[in-house]
């Protein structure tokens, strides 16, 4: 294929063009020549050119047939007629039925959870269902419980946003005014008790916020989950389903999980087994780590289309109110009377700055003091420790906002690290 002139691909009805870009600095341009096509539920505009870069794994689907013009260097590119999109649109139709009933009776709309192991396309299915909902005039909420990657905020947090318009083809959903809660670990296993507490709090606030707008109330919530589905991971899924009052659970590509949920969730919950798309690519541990890093980098620096210019400034140790949620475990014999070992998992403890703090991402909490409900308080944003100077008793912070930190700023430690080598 010539990189300069590109190639036209003719797709029949109910088929999709899939391509992947793995090479650094590679750029692929796509335009819809004729017909109708969509990317994960967002309609492509005819003759408009869309640009994709390194790491893109794209599947452009057509219900009626179309011609696409593609130019640039791809590692994989093919047309597939084997696609689960018809099943996915049926799920949307079922949710829409629930929404119409909720609208008539002035009730909360459906809460649908998407579950499955890693790399089966959970985030993509969420995006498709949200886009379809918006295209028929709904305003659903999107809750992301995947602390390993984070599609709304960065990894190590859970977050919710209101979806008012379809996702941008190249950049995804607008991340305007997200509700973000700090967890501080890359997996729920980092602190299972804290994870459940944070999920419960966000579910409570999210369900309450459905009442703020009639259209949102009947539109409901789409919930994305972690890829840990065995043992304690499965227990977290059951906890989330209960906390959100899920009425539908879409299980991607795992019959065992489907049957376990059929057995364990209340009878009124619809559990549906769905195939994953053949275009879903399994990611190595290194690729997942790179994706996490890229999300943090974009948080501070934006991207080529919309660059950000963060600030670096110094904060003295004496002005740094830094805490961590979760104290080291103690034997029961050492615990104060009436306190359980699990209580330590949600205890807020002060962190003394040391060189070990360098590169760690910190969350800026809206809580004003540790006496406040820190776990149940959302965060304003994130900063990163780029230097620790023990002689001068100061740290250097990378922040989206200029100095100083807000008065009484309370920072929360995270195990996430970011090497700021941006040039």
From Swiss-Prot:
Record bears the keyword Nucleus: yes
Compartments where located: Nucleus
Entry GO MF terms: ATP binding; polynucleotide 5'-hydroxyl-kinase activity
A GO cellular component entry from the record: mRNA cleavage factor complex
Key words, A-Z: ATP-binding, mRNA processing, Nucleotide-binding, Nucleus
Gene Ontology process terms (BP): mRNA 3'-end processing; tRNA splicing, via endonucleolytic cleavage and ligation
Stored CDD domains: SIMIBI
InterPro entries: Clp1 (IPR028606), Clp1/Grc3 (IPR045116), Clp1_C (IPR010655), Clp1_C_sf (IPR038238), Clp1_N (IPR032324), Clp1_N_sf (IPR038239), CLP1_P (IPR032319), P-loop_NTPase (IPR027417)
Binding-site list for ATP: 16, 57, 119-124
Pfam families noted in UniProt: Clp1 (PF06807), CLP1_N (PF16573), CLP1_P (PF16575)
Transmembrane domains' residue ranges: none
Stated role: Required for endonucleolytic cleavage during polyadenylation-dependent pre-mRNA 3'-end formation.
HAMAP family: Clp1
Family: Belongs to the Clp1 family. Clp1 subfamily.
Protein known as: Protein CLP1 homolog
